[in-house]
Amino acid sequence: MILTVTPNPAVDHTIHFDEPLQTGVVHRTDDAVFTAGGKGINVAKYASALDADVTASGFLGGHFGKFVRDRLDADGIASDFVTVDADTRLNTTVLAADGEYKLNHNGPQIRAADVDELVETAQANEPDTLLVGGSLPPGMSLSDVDRLARAGDWKIAVDMGGEYLAELDADYYVCKPNRSELAAATGRTVETEADAVEAAEELHARGFEYVLASLGADGALLVTDDEVLSAPALDVEVVDTVGAGDAVMSGFLAAREHGLSDADALRMGVLTASRVVGVAGTRVPDLEDVLTNETHVEVTTVRTR
């Protein structure tokens, strides 16, 4: 079983405008989507669609927290959240003719007692894999993440920002940086695939068993103990990139839970992301739809190690 922990979940509000945004102008639209969001929650939604046994956890509070719970219940996704006093945040993505704008809140204040309850929740669920995804809310630190990682006999997956990956010092199962997070975590310039390979191998050397790097239109890389694998992105129309990296992690974890190989797990990550970017918001892809393009993703070995 996979337990996803989202310390700082959100209601994702995605708005679409056909015209460029202008200062001082009131822009109106009927094209708006509200979804339950946050990296761990997204992974839970996508992995569940891929027939993985998954439960979503983390901190929720207030009206927006209730929205997240209700939406997960409606989608048939198991959840076991810790209730906190402050409100869950609202994150807004604006898709306009002149680009994509992201407006994120910091999140609620978390108390030490909340972290204690989260650790107890994880222990009660006894997962095989525990994923920590997204930013940390005020009051929670990386030492709390490490405590969560060591609180049970489970594999730890992390999908966090580069500033967090730079500080983590533990033998974790897998991390999933994107290009900018690879750069932030290693202090390297990451522009080419070769740059990404070097940065990902550095993270692997720090103790991650797998480094799964999502590179947007350039696909994804997987660094293992034995080799570096590469999978190209599918040529699809991109509507919204929100949740794309989460989809890569979801496909990987779901495939590993089903006993698939490293190459097939990387392929599943790329396939899942290819479906997610085709719709606005973090809507859940259908497994049958994901597998439609299975033969179109050729995984290659970049190098052996």
Curated annotation (Swiss-Prot):
The protein's Enzyme Commission number: 2.7.1.56
Induction: Expression is highly up-regulated in presence of fructose.
Reported pH dependence: Optimum pH is between 7.5 and 9.
Keywords: ATP-binding, Kinase, Nucleotide-binding, Transferase
Signal peptide bounds: none
Residues at which ATP binds: 214-219, 245-246
GO cellular component: cytosol
One of the Pfam families matching this protein, by short name: PfkB
Active site: 246 (proton acceptor)
Catalytic activity: beta-D-fructose 1-phosphate + ATP = beta-D-fructose 1,6-bisphosphate + ADP + H(+)
CDD domains: FruK_PfkB_like
InterPro entries: Carboh/pur_kinase_PfkB_CS, PfkB_dom, pfkB_Halo, Ribokinase-like, Tagatose/fructose_Pkinase
MF terms in GO: 1-phosphofructokinase activity; ATP binding
Iron found in the keyword field: no
Effect of inactivating the gene: Loss of growth on fructose. Growth on glucose is not affected.
Domain of life: Archaea
PROSITE patterns: PFKB_KINASES_2
Gene3D superfamilies per UniProt: 3.40.1190.20
Function (record text): Catalyzes the ATP-dependent phosphorylation of fructose-l-phosphate to fructose-l,6-bisphosphate. Involved in the utilization of fructose as a sole carbon and energy source.
Family membership noted in the UniProt record: Belongs to the carbohydrate kinase PfkB family.
Subunit structure, interactors included: Homodimer.
PANTHER family per record: 1-PHOSPHOFRUCTOKINASE-RELATED, ATP-DEPENDENT 6-PHOSPHOFRUCTOKINASE ISOZYME 2
Record-given protein name: 1-phosphofructokinase
Lineage of source species: Archaea, Methanobacteriati, Methanobacteriota, Stenosarchaea group, Halobacteria
